[in-house]
Amino acid sequence: MRGNARGPRPNVANPGKLLLRLLSYIFKNYGFACIIVVICLFITVFSSVQGTLFMQTLIDDYIIPLTKQASPDFTELAHAIGRVAIFYACGVLASFAQSKIMVYVTQGTLRNLRNDMFIHMEGLPIRYFDTHPHGDIMSTYTNDIDTLRQMISQSIPQVLNSAVTIVSVLGAMIVLNIPLTIITLFMVGVMLYATKVVGGASAKYFIAQQRDIATVNGYIEEMMNGQKVVKVFTHEEESIADFNKLNDQLFESADNANKFGNILMPINAQLGNVSYVLVALVGGILALEGAGGFTLGKLASFLTFNKSFSQPINQLSMQINNIVMALAGSERIFNLLDEKPETDDGYVTLVRAKKENGQITECSERTGMWAWKHVHQADGSVDYIELKGDVVFDDVDFGYNPDKMVLHNVDLFATPGQKIAFVGSTGAGKTTITNLINRFYDIQDGKIRYDGININKIKKDDLRHSLGIVLQDTHLFTATVMENIRYGKLDATDEEVIAAAKLANADTFIHQLPDGYNTLLTGDGANLSQGQRQLLAIARAAIADPPVLILDEATSSIDTRTEKIVQDGMDKLMRGRTTFVIAHRLSTVRNSDCIMVLEQGRIIERGNHEQLMEEHGKYYQLYTGNLAE
């Protein structure tokens, strides 16, 4: 079970480089839209600055002179206000357009990221999914993507707006009065220092919060998948205790992150008020004395700029939290995208074929015959080798980690039509051998040949297309029964689907479902029994009509009565095909042509049932022990 050990707080590596990569990704797909957003942003800021500068003109050139006139004429004032109103209207329209375009850019970027992530994930090797918690991967698609949504739609536009506003307002303040500008800049420096201290303290906790959320999601998924085991062993209290530890860890990181993050804006707001008071005090004295031509109108404009100058600083400090969280999420997203995809240096492909006058040729029509198309790299000549299902392991060594071998000197051969069974205790290497046939993993030493061809030369998609597999853990997709069976051969007709179901003896129970073959399965087929789910998996393998079958404990979860029904169909399916079977019930492999007994990654016995029983070795012990049960 998981403990509550806490390591050092994680940090985002190269945040600047990460931010640049994210911005490049956005601009690559929506560059023109981003340019329009920046233009709209400049128009918005320009209209705001012009409106503030007009305040000086309004007071000094219109209001004060008009108060001194006996019969004031407001015509020129009305014209001036009209011109400013046009500026403000342009700013409002630009701000509206900016918001609309950013929604489009944000949602489009997230859609592209999800697409890129999923496409890339589908190309990753099985090793990645064996070594990364599925909850962590799911958190990347949900929580991390959501933090990016906030950053792209809110933080980035706000940061740009604030930056342009700061530069524009600073220029206007310098023009109005340099001493007051120096006071304002000094207070801004104090605010930036506060932002650095408080923001730096919160950043590490926001990063940890993202990691802790992924950990909690992973644990919840783990417990959901293992609920039966939890209840059988009455481990509810232990699982709750472990969850509470992880949840408390998440609470601690989230509490610390928001504790620091939430005080940053109030601190800067109060410092902004101090700046405003200082400027008002000094500026009032300058205006009353008329020093340097400083007027009440200029003071009014400067005070507004002072607030406008501190406001973007506050907004920047507020967005720091979102940016840090988003960078932590984007780091995980780009880590997924940077994972090396499954390599495939094979060049031998599987093609439809026909045989005429003893010669195998490639064709496009369905003939029921397949062949390996071997284009020799040396001279470009082409050989066609009939797909039969001849599999040979030649002195194979393999380890999931190179420094720890799990298979040693494995030699085996299976000719077309043979049924090869692997037996042995858990962890002996039975399933590993089938993983190597699929090239889910590549061997460290030795050779595996398929119809005389080294499987490293065969393209992985074509290799796997030639194999029918029933995995130990049956997985059904959210689709109809017919679509789940058709997954083994996407262009199969309805008649072929039904024929495969009959072969697997699944047709009877399918007709008993509410909508028969059109019954929608959800939740991994949760409304079906384990035996029914396994029958559908066998039908899925049957429809592929492969020359080689891999049955990884295909009947180990089926009751005895169902097993007999399945076995009858499987015997028909296996006829004429090379079949590798792994089963704990040794009675299901008695009729195998060859039984191989594995122990600690080595084949220690081989032969048919009668031969192995006569040897009184490991197989004899397993078999008699099985009967004794």
Residue ranges and their predicted role:
Residues 8-16, 47-63, 87-134, 138-142, ...:
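Juxtamembrane helix-loop junctions of ABC transporter transmembrane domains
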Residues 24, 32-57, 80, 84, ...:
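Alpha-helical segments in transporter systems
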Residues 29, 33-46, 154-208, 279-294, ...:
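Transmembrane helices of ABC transporter permease
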Residues 117, 121, 230, 333, ...:
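Helix-loop junctions and hydrophobic alpha-helical segments within the transmembrane domains
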Residues 1-48, 63-84, 98-102, 106, ...:
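Membrane-integrated ABC transporters
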Residues 126-127, 145-152, 156, 160, ...:
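An intracellular "coupling" helix at the cytosolic face of ABC transporter transmembrane type-1 domains
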Residues 65, 172-186, 256, 260-331, ...:
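Helix-loop-helix
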Residues 70, 353-629:
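ABC-type nucleotide-binding domain
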